[in-house]
């Protein structure tokens, strides 16, 4: 991208697989850049490290065998968690909470958050604002990704998560 004109000059793929890749979520940790793209057709969720010197990605860890879609990793609740919908109902009303198994390192489903409508699928990274946690979500009532909604997220005393749409 030309920073003066904001025009796209060139594109170079950094990760190419024989299966579908999308939703390239990015983590930055201790000077490293990690990417975990949606790739349920490839058999689950994998973590890649982006190597700027070669402009490519190297697979470093298999995170989950679940066929997660638009997964979001967060530590906003004091522990590493992944929130995601899952095939075959990726655009539905159930958001899975995945926790890391300490012995295997894999993320496993530990909770399901059920909505009354198809708004479970993530639409980007979660964020904080004025001490509250928010998540962008896709409203797929009409069709996949028809609208974007923002939900305030809280972890209740019983450990379950609650979501409230904000306007």
What are these regions (language model features)?
Residues 1-167:
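Carbohydrate-active catalytic/glycan-binding domains of CAZyme proteins
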